[in-house]
């Protein structure tokens, strides 16, 4: 990989082409923000299905256990666990149901490192869907923290680019991850593109005649 790509990837406002043979370019953070304001979006509602088996919702959705039952929710990922500007549920809140709970104490602030939860959240969602079951990923409004974790899951588990993941979800739910979260999703996109390029290079090397 060229040193030019590495230096560009450190600038969150620059577009980066990781694979020189690909037409795909990871946008800068400001360009990612523009995706949420381009074209018609969907109206805000309490909960939406954004992928088979995956629902993004808000605090109201998470608190209404009968409603979760009606949706067939078997797993709840609370991306806003904690006391301040968060949703106070926890595993005990669902103890009289068959719901499996996973909580993440994430602050909806641009400076918060939500990327530390990308892999454990994706693993929880993956395990829920492998049954197959339905999982609710929520925060207070269901627009930033929960949306960010679902976008990361789609990128890691389904090989969607950050652009394709955003476009897919925003057509089904009104989402708006904060600026810092978009930076981290952009960094994830570059990391995943680099890993795929490395794998492709290794495969091509193995296929060359000796």
Curated annotation (Swiss-Prot):
It comes from the Eukaryota. Substrate binds at residues 138-145. GO terms for biological process: negative regulation of MAPK cascade; protein dephosphorylation. It is an enzyme of class 3 (hydrolase). GO terms for cellular component: cytoplasm; nucleus. Keywords: Cytoplasm, Hydrolase, Nucleus, Protein phosphatase. The active site is at residue 139. Its main location: cytoplasm. Pfam families: DSPc. It catalyses: O-phospho-L-tyrosyl-[protein] + H2O = L-tyrosyl-[protein] + phosphate; O-phospho-L-seryl-[protein] + H2O = L-seryl-[protein] + phosphate; O-phospho-L-threonyl-[protein] + H2O = L-threonyl-[protein] + phosphate. Residues 46-194 form the Tyrosine-protein phosphatase domain. InterPro entries: Atypical_DUSP_subfamA (IPR020405), Dual-sp_phosphatase_cat-dom (IPR000340), Prot-tyrosine_phosphatase-like (IPR029021), Tyr_Pase_AS (IPR016130), Tyr_Pase_cat (IPR003595), Tyr_Pase_dom (IPR000387), TYR_PHOSPHATASE_DUAL_dom (IPR020422). It is found in: Cytoplasm; Nucleus. Belongs to the protein-tyrosine phosphatase family. Non-receptor class dual specificity subfamily. Dual specificity phosphatase able to dephosphorylate phosphotyrosine, phosphoserine and phosphothreonine residues, with a preference for phosphotyrosine as a substrate. Dual specificity phosphatase able to dephosphorylate phosphotyrosine, phosphoserine and phosphothreonine residues within the same substrate, with a preference for phosphotyrosine as a substrate. Involved in the modulation of AMPK and MAPK1/2 signaling pathways. This is Dual specificity phosphatase 29. It comes from Takifugu rubripes (Japanese pufferfish). The gene is Dusp29.
């Amino acid at each position: 990989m060229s040193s030019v790509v590495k230096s560009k990837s450190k600038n969150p406002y620059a577009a980066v082409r990781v694979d020189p043979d690909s037409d795909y370019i990871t946008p800068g953070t400001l360009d990612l923000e523009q995706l949420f304001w381009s074209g018609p979006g969907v109206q805000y509602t309490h909960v939406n299905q954004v992928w088979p088996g995956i629902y993004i919702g808000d605090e109201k959705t998470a608190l209404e256990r009968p409603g979760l039952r009606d949706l067939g929710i078997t797993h709840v990922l609370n991306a806003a666990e904690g006391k301040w500007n968060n949703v106070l549920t926890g595993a005990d809140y669902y103890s009289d149901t068959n719901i499996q709970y996973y909580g993440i104490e994430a602050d909806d602030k641009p400076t918060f490192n939500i990327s530390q939860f990308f892999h454990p959240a994706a693993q929880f969602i993956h395990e829920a869907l492998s049954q197959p079951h339905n999982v609710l990923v929520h925060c207070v409004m269901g627009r930033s923290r929960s949306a960010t974790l679902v976008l990361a899951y789609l990128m890691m588990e389904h090989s969607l680019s950050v652009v394709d993941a955003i476009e897919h979800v925003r057509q089904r739910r009104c989402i708006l991850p904060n600026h810092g979260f978009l930076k981290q999703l952009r960094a994830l996109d570059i990391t995943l593109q680099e890993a795929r390029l490395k794998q492709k290079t290794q495969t091509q090397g193995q296929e060359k005649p000796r």
